[in-house]
């Protein structure tokens, strides 16, 4: 989830959003497949060199000159004009009728943007409790990109969840 917001943040958020629309973002290119892998590992030191190369082949493509370009939409870098209204989100979550698998990473960095660990842990637990049928799991030795860090462990959790 995202950090709570307050209405007083709206004017600056709209200004930031409009500024970012005026100056559209772009995706950086890289000189080689190995440079893409290095960039992935810079963001995620748990990523093995082999897995980083594998992901590079799926995350970026080379052009005719040999430069590698990330296959992402640069617009995802633009801040949302709308504030994250936690209570509205939770009202929606209360209406979920399907079972939910909530997976967390042992080395998450959610504390960096949501606040002190003890407070955030309590807030995450509060949010999770509104989901009528939720099963939680923790993946060891994984961070924010847990699907990159421990894909086999995540796949096992999902498979077990789906057959229950």
Predicted regions and their residues:
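Hydrophobic "lid"/C-terminal helical patch
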Residues: 154, 158, 162
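Nucleotide-sugar-dependent glycosyltransferase donor-binding/catalytic pocket residues
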Residues: 4, 109, 144-147
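Alpha/beta-hydrolase
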Residues: 28-115
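Flexible "cap/lid" loop of the alpha/beta hydrolase fold
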Residues: 1-33
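Short, glycine/charged-enriched secondary-structure capping and boundary segments
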Residues: 9-14, 115-119, 151-154
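Catalytic histidine-centered segment of alpha/beta-hydrolase-like enzymes
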Residues: 136-151, 155
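Conserved loop-alpha-helix segment in the C-terminal half of the alpha/beta-hydrolase fold
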Residues: 94-142
């Amino acid at each position: 989830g995202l950090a709570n917001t307050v209405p007083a943040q709206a004017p600056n958020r709209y200004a930031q959003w409009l500024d970012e629309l005026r100056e559209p973002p772009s995706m950086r290119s890289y000189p080689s497949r190995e440079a893409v892998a290095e960039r992935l590992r810079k963001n995620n030191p748990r990523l093995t060199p082999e897995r980083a190369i594998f992901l590079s082949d799926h995350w970026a493509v080379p052009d005719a000159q040999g430069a590698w370009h990330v296959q992402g939409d640069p617009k995802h870098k633009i801040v949302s004009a709308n504030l994250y209204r936690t209570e509205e989100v939770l009202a929606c979550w209360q209406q979920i009728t399907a079972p939910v698998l909530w997976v967390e990473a042992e080395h998450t960095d959610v504390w960096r943007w949501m606040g002190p660990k003890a407070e955030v842990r309590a807030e995450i637990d509060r949010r999770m409790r509104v989901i009528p049928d939720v099963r939680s799991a923790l993946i060891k030795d994984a961070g924010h990109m847990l699907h990159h860090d421990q894909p086999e462990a995540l796949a096992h959790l999902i498979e077990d969840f789906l057959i229950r």
